[in-house]
Swiss-Prot record:
Region (Positively charged region required for RNA-binding): 244-253, 296-297
Protein's name according to its UniProt entry: N(6)-adenosine-methyltransferase non-catalytic subunit METTL14
Taxonomy of the source species: Eukaryota, Metazoa, Chordata, Craniata, Vertebrata
Assembly and binders: Heterodimer; heterodimerizes with mettl3 to form an antiparallel heterodimer that constitutes an active methyltransferase. Component of the WMM complex, a N6-methyltransferase complex composed of a catalytic subcomplex, named MAC, and of an associated subcomplex, named MACOM. The MAC subcomplex is composed of mettl3 and mettl14.
Gly residues composition-biased segments: 407-421
UniProt organism field: Danio rerio (Zebrafish)
């Protein structure tokens, strides 16, 4: 109880500090001097209305007086204006508000609280709106969902038990033929060094940039399995369209867009180098996900487990010059696809990971051996990590398809052009050859009976 009370007090203290900064007060204790109460605001409005009313009434009265006494109306009106205007300025002067910040124009101006106007809060404080998303990290994301948290724990244990030893190969994809890996991969993660990353960070790159024409020339279609997935980091600019073109060229269909949202809680107000091709500062990146072959979540539970994670990654923005992607992308891929043949292109020493083959030009060493790597998948279906009964029970699944009886149907009903066209027996009779129609129980034309029988 004491810890909970202490937490509430700390939040209240932080809230008062933010309000003091927002309202331009010297300290959190002086917020009351800056804010006006509702009674004071009402009194100010009444005084203003009185001043305006007295000014509006005084001028016509002076004009009528001039006309009654026969004096020159223009001279008297000018004299009255000179008498009234200084008085109006003196009366209304003390009540003119000086806007020190944008607090008056925020949502809910009657209380002068910032409420949830996160865009204006960013302008005033430098805190990005995504800083206030709750439970964004891996540790506390499923804190209120014990079933999902248990599922994640069980899947992590299974993945760590079935992962292959980490392997890595120092090679430049520009000159290295990927077909020499002699393996068809279930998952391929591509992290090309785009020029966009270095333009935003304002640093000089140690490796050459890759344009989208070079990325499209990669032989991804030659090293991907019949049913497989590719994850392509494409930045936040022109790569969103050009990345889709790459997926189509490699034989993949775009099925998802994983968005990395960058927060600045530790360094609010920090401004990045503005990209000359952008109007605003970009605070997110995209990872396009492509699918090859036929994979259905309802029938291919041995290969994919859908809806285990979300399609958002919310982490703190890396330091200036750091272009590494969040490690959470590996968790998303491993939780989703049960294939164990995983390839990471353009990897670095910091991204070497169990269960993955890392290939990149900046790696400092190599331990990849084709024969050793192939032995991990020599048995039938050994490329799959498998699934336990508990994981199968906890994971989200598609609802089972309803049977004909549950949908309220018995025998197939007639339709247009189907085997039972029309309605009931008449539709089935119509499908017989040489059918001429029955009317009133008597067949065709002529004969002893014509037309309908008498009633």
């Amino acid at each position: 109880m004491n810890s909970r009370l202490q937490e509430i007090r700390e939040r209240q203290k932080l809230r008062r500090q933010l309000l003091a900064q927002q309202l331009g007060a010297e300290s959190p204790d002086s917020i009351g001097a800056v804010l006006n109460s509702k009674d004071e605001q009402k009194e100010i409005e009444e005084t203003r209305e009185t001043c305006r009313a007295s000014f509006d009434i005084s001028v016509p009265g002076a004009k009528r007086k001039c006309l009654n006494e026969g004096e020159d109306p223009e001279e008297d009106v000018e004299e009255q204006k000179e008498d009234v205007e200084p008085q109006h300025q003196e009366e209304s002067g003390p009540y003119e508000e000086v806007y020190k910040d944008s607090s008056t124009f925020l949502k809910g101006t009657q209380s002068l609280n910032p409420h949830n106007d996160y865009c204006q809060h960013f302008v005033d404080t430098g805190h990005r709106p995504q800083n206030f998303i709750r439970d964004g990290g891996l540790a506390d994301r499923f804190e209120e969902y014990p079933k999902q948290r248990e599922l994640i724990r069980l899947k992590d244990e299974l993945i760590s038990a079935t992962n292959t030893p980490p392997m890595y190969l120092q090679a430049d994809p520009d000159t290295f033929d990927l077909r020499e890996l002699k393996c068809k991969f279930d998952v391929i993660l591509i992290e090309p060094p785009l020029e966009e990353y270095y333009r935003e960070s304002g640093i000089i790159a140690n490796e050459r940039f890759w344009n989208w024409d070079d990325i499209m020339k990669l032989n991804i279609e030659e090293i991907s399995s019949i049913r497989s997935f590719v994850f392509l980091w494409c930045g936040s600019g022109e790569g969103l369209d050009l990345g889709r073109m790459c997926l189509r060229k490699w034989g993949f269909r775009r099925c998802e867009d994983i968005c990395w949202i960058k927060t600045n809680k530790n360094n609010p107000g920090k401004t990045k180098t503005l990209d000359p091709k952008a109007v605003f500062q970009r605070t997110k990146e995209h990872c396009l996900m492509g699918i090859k072959g036929t994979v259905r979540r309802s029938t291919d539970g041995d290969f994919i487990h859908a809806n285990v994670d979300i399609d958002l990654i919310i982490t703190e923005e890396p330091e200036m010059g750091n272009i590494e992607k969040p490690v959470e992308i590996f968790h998303i891929i491993e939780h989703f696809c049960l294939g164990r043949r995983r390839l990471h292109l353009f990897g670095r020493d910091s991204t070497i990971r169990p269960g993955w083959l890392t290939v990149g030009p900046t790696l400092t060493n190599s331990n990849f051996n084709i024969e050793v790597y192939s032995t991990h998948f020599s048995e039938p279906n050994s490329y799959l990590s498998g699934c336990t009964e508990e994981i199968e029970r906890l994971r989200p699944k598609s609802p089972p398809p309803k049977s004909m009886a549950e949908r309220g149907g018995g025998a197939p009903r007639g339709g247009r052009g189907g085997p039972a066209a029309g309605r009931g027996d008449r539709g089935r009779e119509r499908n017989r050859p040489n059918f001429r129609g029955d009317r009133g129980g008597f067949r065709g034309r002529g004969g002893p009976h014509r037309g309908f029988p008498p009633r």
